[in-house]
From Swiss-Prot:
Highest taxon, organism lineage: Bacteria
NCBIfam families linked: tyrS (TIGR00234)
Protein name: Tyrosine--tRNA ligase
Oligomer and partners: Homodimer.
Function, in words: Catalyzes the attachment of tyrosine to tRNA(Tyr) in a two-step reaction: tyrosine is first activated by ATP to form Tyr-AMP and then transferred to the acceptor end of tRNA(Tyr).
Main location: cytoplasm
Organism (species): Rhodopseudomonas palustris (strain ATCC BAA-98 / CGA009)
Length: 418
């Protein structure tokens, strides 16, 4: 293990954030003096970031916590093009209105992890639409494009993998790495930025930006990537059978976010405590040694600490209490995720397949609902569903005015009268 001088590099190394660094000694020296200005770019392809983005956000947090300056770069410009990295097909082109709406929805996430302001290490937020949308095409080709080798661009994973699979790569996507590289140069000129961070799939684009900066006469630029995380079983972080694990509370309830972390595989608990919480390392080492049933205590701490960072301590504690009430005490917690239904719907009767598939999304389809019923996996008010033609009516309402639907032991939704 490399011995670094700076707190920033030591924290990243001890917690498992470092995958590749372009010039470790030079970057370490800058960080030791509090002179690193680093950015991570986030394209606005959805109304929320997801758990897969958390690694880079946590790196921005630790950068600031160790006295250096973070920049959160909104991809208002690059989203109009679409990043081909890790994609098997061309991204859907969003309207400018959709991009702007997504950008506004995403912005609030960062203030949970970093402090914005005018101080030395205070974070700033930038938007590459500010300079990319003003580029003149001919000038871009002359001043920027001449520094890029098509031969080298064709060797980049984001391009090469698509071509090797004989999958279409549009000209607009091919230009993405040029725009990302120019972002680095522009941030260097405007804000003295000297480091770009990102996932390991971005290494090629980032070092291309480092090279462009050298060719265009900026100060020395640096690259640092974190691993692309998968779980111990090989699943991609941030994805579940039900879809993406969103960070915005209006797209994924804090309770469901808590449950995502609570369901962490045993082999991942120690690693995730290092990456996704602010707990001190000695406490993490203690929790990582727990075995058998005791490891569930570590999982609850992981879930509560990760949820507190994203949604606040009150929401995290409420989620933990809801889980305890639901699973350990056998109750129907009012803080479970809920879906409103009308009195008219209930009076007419709601088919159990519709309730589980369409109303609550506990299952993906009517077919899956039927399979779960046969396997004994669906329950209404804690009673197994045995008849796929069952209809929910007002008689199924509890004294609290809700109907509890469950799939397995850990997925629950309440139907609540509007």
């Amino acid at each position: 293990m490399t011995a670094f001088k700076s707190d920033f590099m030591n924290v990243l190394q001890s917690r498992g954030f470092i995958h590749q660094i372009s010039d470790p000694d030079s970057l370490d020296a800058l960080a030791a003096k509090g002179e690193v200005v680093a950015y991570v770019g986030y394209d606005c392809t959805a109304a929320s970031l997801h758990v897969g983005h958390l690694l880079s956000i946590m790196m921005l947090h630790w950068l600031q916590a160790t006295g250096n300056k973070p920049i959160a770069l909104m991809g208002g410009g690059t989203t109009r093009v679409g990043d081909p990295s890790g994609r098997d097909e061309t991204r859907k082109i969003l309207t400018y209105e959709q991009i702007d709406a997504n950008k506004e929805s995403i912005k609030g996430t960062f203030s949970k992890f970093i402090k914005f302001g005018d101080g030395h290490s205070d974070a700033l937020m930038a938007d590459n639409a500010e300079w990319l949308t003003k580029l003149n095409y001919i000038e871009m080709l002359r001043e920027i494009g001449r520094h890029f080798s098509i031969n080298r661009m064709l060797t980049m994973d984001s391009v090469k993998l698509r071509l090797d699979r004989e999958q279409e790569l549009s000209f607009i996507e091919f230009n993405y790495m040029i725009l990302q590289s120019y972002d680095f140069v522009e941030l260097a000129r405007r804000y003295k930025c000297n480091l770009q961070m990102g996932g390991s799939d971005q290494w090629g684009n980032i070092v291309t930006g480092v090279d462009l900066g050298r060719r265009m006469g900026t100060h020395q630029l640096h690259a640092l990537t974190c691993p692309l995380l998968t779980t111990a079983s090989g699943a991609k972080m941030g994805k579940t059978a039900a879809g993406a694990v969103w960070l915005n509370g209006d797209m994924l309830a804090p309770y469901d976010y808590w449950q995502y972390w609570r369901n962490t595989e045993d082999a991942d608990v120690g690693r995730f405590l290092k990456l996704f919480t602010l707990l001190p390392m000695d406490e993490i080492e203690r929790l990582s040694k727990l075995q058998g049933a005791e490891i569930n205590d570590a999982k609850k701490i992981l879930a509560t600490e990760a949820t507190a960072l994203m949604h606040g301590r009150e929401a995290a504690d409420k989620a933990e209490t809801t889980a305890r009430t639901t699973f350990e005490q056998g109750g129907t917690a009012q803080d479970l995720p809920s879906v409103e239904i009308s009195r008219g719907e209930l009076d007419a009767g709601i088919g159990v397949l519709v309730a589980f598939a369409e109303k609550t999304g506990l299952v993906a389809s009517n077919g899956e609902a039927r399979r779960q019923i046969k396997a004994g996996g669906l329950k209404v008010n804690d009673a197994p569903v045995t008849d796929e033609k069952m209809t929910l009516t007002a008689t199924d309402l509890s004294s609290d005015g809700v109907i509890k639907l469950s799939m397995g032991k850990k997925k629950h939704v309440l139907l609540r009268l509007a």
